[in-house]
């Protein structure tokens, strides 16, 4: 009976965690086939859009390779580490809280157990520029593959531009 209750609790936690994560999921813009396969799913490049949850007025777009074939379809193939990133100011910038240099903005699993992709955020206080870095890592070793994008914080309309340094945690 104990095992059944524990299994039910794990199932509920897993299901509710999945629903909570959906709010942060990026929006798929499009996919482009890179390797055509007749009898299994194609390999593709997928481009996504993601709004920074802490910094209103900033949107990032990233492109990731998606492995084709049956292993890729089932989630057993290890995804490649090449990820491109572009972030832009798309409206007036406002901060909903403070953040640390290198704080996670978004995280996604790229293989069943070992690899994850991360987009982290920082602030170049001297130039009043938000800096975004995307990279993938493994439990044992990281990957040198990365991409950086910067967003100079500019005034929007009549509002003065906020200073990102004012929202950095010490």
PLM regions and their residue ranges:
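Short, low-complexity disordered leader/linker segments with a strong preference
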Residues: 15-16, 20
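Bacterial N-terminal signal peptides
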Residues: 7-14
């Amino acid at each position: 009976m104990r095992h059944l209750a524990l299994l039910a609790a794990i199932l509920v936690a897993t299901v509710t965690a999945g629903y909570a994560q959906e709010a942060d999921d990026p929006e798929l813009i499009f996919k482009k086939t890179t390797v055509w396969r007749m009898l299994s799913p194609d390999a593709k490049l997928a481009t996504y859009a993601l709004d920074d949850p802490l910094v209103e007025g900033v949107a990032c777009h990233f492109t990731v390779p998606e492995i084709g074939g049956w292993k890729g379809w089932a989630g057993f193939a290890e995804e490649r580490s090449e990820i491109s990133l572009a972030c832009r100011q798309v409206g007036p910038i406002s901060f909903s809280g403070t953040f640390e240099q290198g704080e996670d903005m978004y995280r996604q699993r790229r293989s069943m157990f070992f690899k994850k992709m991360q987009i982290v955020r920082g602030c170049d206080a001297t130039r009043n520029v938000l800096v975004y870095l995307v990279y993938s890592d493994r439990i044992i070793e990281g990957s040198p593959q990365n991409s950086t994008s910067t967003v100079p914080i500019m005034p929007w309309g009549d509002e003065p531009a906020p200073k990102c340094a004012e929202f950095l945690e010490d």
